[in-house]
A protein has these predicted regions:
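Membrane-spanning alpha-helical segments of multipass transporters and channels
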Residues: 1-229
Length: 229
């Protein structure tokens, strides 16, 4: 019949020929998860800043100032240190060989992420004191599985899938992923804008809610040493 037996055997062994083409390829697993660990480092770094610095401004020798002025008195120091942390972390990523299509946007994205995270942690800590600091810890614990940093969010339990769009890490990680694997449409700007929404919420908490709780917080701070003694 003129049929080549070898051709038939090859067809039966592999009836479909697949051609693979990588879209936005990432050269290593380390580069793939670098956005997650970079975000984690920036959040932890911001939390450490809040933990080691006194958040309330000393009134001695300054005179009277408003609650808003007191809030920004520590704010400037913290965001500057947070920006320095972001530069060190992102440049460090580049030095150790993390894949990056656009190094400049990678570093600038890290600074924007750190700025947002420091504002969130600072607002929570100054407004709700120890409870706010505890919320900061809870947030980082929840965001590790809920941000799709290491595994697709579809593989996570339903609770974390529900939280996924509500977490700052989700957009911080996606922001850096754009600079690692390659840009797609306006995703970089979209994630940057969502981080801006979190920033606005943080400023609202710090500037609007904090003054309402200021007297209660001062009373709590005065009573705390007495209880310890």
């Amino acid at each position: 019949m003129g049929v080549d037996v070898n051709d038939v055997a090859d067809f039966m062994a592999s009836p479909v020929e697949l051609t693979s083409k990588s879209i936005y390829p990432v050269k290593s697993f380390g580069s793939g998860i670098a956005p997650f660990y970079t975000n984690l480092a920036l959040w932890v770094g911001g939390y450490v800043l809040i933990a080691i610095y006194k958040l309330e401004v000393d009134r001695e020798g300054i005179g009277s100032f408003t609650a808003r002025q007191g809030y920004f008195g520590r704010w400037m120091l913290l965001v500057i240190l947070g920006a320095l942390q972001a530069i060190i972390v992102t440049v460090g990523d580049l030095v150790i060989g993390v894949q990056c299509i656009n190094p400049l946007l990678f570093v600038l994205g890290g600074i924007a992420i750190s700025f947002t995270y420091v504002n969130i942690i600072y607002a929570l800590s100054t407004t709700f004191k120890h409870i706010g600091k505890a919320i900061g810890v809870i947030l980082v614990i929840v965001q590790i599985p809920g941000s799709s940093g290491m595994y697709p969010i579809e593989m996570m339990p339903g609770f974390f899938q529900w939280l996924h769009p509500l977490l700052p890490f989700t957009y911080g990680i996606n922001l850096l992923r754009e600079t690692v694997g390659g840009m797609y449409s306006f995703n970089y700007l979209f994630n940057l804008c969502i981080l801006g929404v979190f920033l606005i919420v943080a400023l609202f908490i710090g500037l609007q809610l904090r003054p309402l709780l200021l007297n209660l917080n001062l009373l709590f701070d005065k009573q705390l040493p007495r209880r310890g003694s």
